[in-house]
Amino acid sequence: MRKAHIFRQTKETAIDMEIDLDGSGVYQIETPVGFLNHMMESFSKHSFIDIKLKAEGDIDVSYHHLVEDVGIVLGQAISKALGDKSGINRYGFAILPMDEALVLCSLDFSGRGLFFYDRKDLRGKITEFDFELIWEFIKGFALESKATVHIKILDGHILHHIAECSIKSLAFSVRQAVAKQDKGILSTKGLL
């Protein structure tokens, strides 16, 4: 059973998440940040990972803590559910469009949590949501899932589309990488 439950509480946030890697993309997402809900629903749907999430935080200060911490907990949950990573594809990649936006994501559950992205110049708001929080979310996910993640924005000018396309391409890449195979651990070292 490739499932995990993580509860994380700090002075800034309280997050309770359950996942099933072998699900069908069923989700129950409850946070006080509408755009974060939308992104988590999209991640669940396109990764085929069932996600139950209840999260709250000091959004009166900023959305930053909550968004970053949800990414952290998602990464922790996936890492826990994968165990020693035996029998997974390890790698995943996608180039996905959303209207004018085109985003590439490449992912490796290598055991090394790293995140690289381009277009650091993109700034702005999606309703009350700061666009750059998408990068904080993915960075938290990458570090805690121990995955190397690359995101390249190939085209686009509407921030909502770029953000959503980034999350969907990440989800699609995760779906490929966690898919089962019967060749053991895909590493010449013998572990990930």
Curated annotation (Swiss-Prot):
GO molecular function: imidazoleglycerol-phosphate dehydratase activity
Protein localization: Cytoplasm
GO BP annotations, alphabetical order: L-histidine biosynthetic process
Catalysed reactions listed for this entry: D-erythro-1-(imidazol-4-yl)glycerol 3-phosphate = 3-(imidazol-4-yl)-2-oxopropyl phosphate + H2O
NCBIfam families noted in UniProt: PRK00951.2-4
Entry keyword annotation includes Lyase: yes
CDD domains recorded: IGPD (cd07914)
Family: Belongs to the imidazoleglycerol-phosphate dehydratase family.
Functional pathway: Amino-acid biosynthesis; L-histidine biosynthesis; L-histidine from 5-phospho-alpha-D-ribose 1-diphosphate: step 6/9
Record's protein name: Imidazoleglycerol-phosphate dehydratase
Pfam family name, one: IGPD
Organism: Hydrogenobaculum sp. (strain Y04AAS1)
Keyword annotations of the record: Amino-acid biosynthesis, Cytoplasm, Histidine biosynthesis, Lyase
Domain of life according to the entry: Bacteria
Enzyme class label: lyase
GO cellular component: cytoplasm
Main location: cytoplasm
EC number: 4.2.1.19
